[in-house]
Amino acid sequence: MMPDHGELLYEGKAKRVFASTDPDRVLVEFKNDATAFNAQKKAQLDGKGRLNCQISARLFDLLEREGVPTHYCGLAGETWMLVRRVRIIPLEVVLRNIATGSLCRQTPIAEGTAIEPALLDLYYKDDSLGDPLLTEARVQLLGVADTAQLSAIEQLARRVNAVLLPFFDELDLQLVDFKLELGLASDGTLLLADEISPDTCRLWDRRNSNAEDRILDKDRFRKDLGGVMEAYGEVLKRVQGNCPNPRNCL
């Protein structure tokens, strides 16, 4: 069911953001669109929005219970959530626990190498530039964040990793790497925003040793492996087992 909402404020590749009756809250609708390679590859996957919304709600709740501040206020439907309005910082914050993907393409590090402590990478959130990898100096040159803000961003990201790693491990899921987006609330509080789902996390099934079959994330779409919705559904099934009842605002 669609909740009452105001005007469309923003539409991205995977979500729409609408005004709500509270100026400090917005409604987010998760779409069924699947995209990869900066939207060069696209598809409609029926049910994807619901799965990502339900997974994200439960993981935001988990993180809040562990003291990580997020924008999440509650579910507002199968594919909707109410969140705090934030000003998104134009950075994609990536934490890497296991070497794979672009890290292995850009360096001689072997696929599957454990990284401890996790590697934190910052990317400039700009599709027209291809989301380039940034140094700390470049982040400051762009005026995106100063030294103190970068320190706060790293602390929050590493706290998220410290909560999610053992949580997924209990579910026989290996948290390979993940992407976070952060934002500033009206009072200046740094909050975890966007979503946490198989669209933004690489998750490998410890119950399956096959290099392709173990993939339970967006790489199934990127690599044309098939079974995307089955993989996302399996992630929700396991997450639900430990986080059955997320907050909702219905």
From Swiss-Prot:
GO terms for molecular function: ATP binding; phosphoribosylaminoimidazolesuccinocarboxamide synthase activity. The gene is purC. Gene3D superfamilies: ATP-grasp fold, B domain, Phosphorylase Kinase, domain 1. It comes from the Bacteria. InterPro entries: SAICAR_synt/ADE2_N (IPR028923), SAICAR_synt_PurC (IPR033934), SAICAR_synth (IPR001636), SAICAR_synthetase (IPR050089), SAICAR_synthetase_CS (IPR018236). One of its GO terms (biological process) is cobalamin biosynthetic process. The lineage of its organism: Bacteria, Bacillati, Cyanobacteriota, Cyanophyceae, Synechococcales. It holds the Pfam family SAICAR_synt. Its EC number is 6.3.2.6. It comes from Synechococcus sp. (strain CC9605). This is Phosphoribosylaminoimidazole-succinocarboxamide synthase.
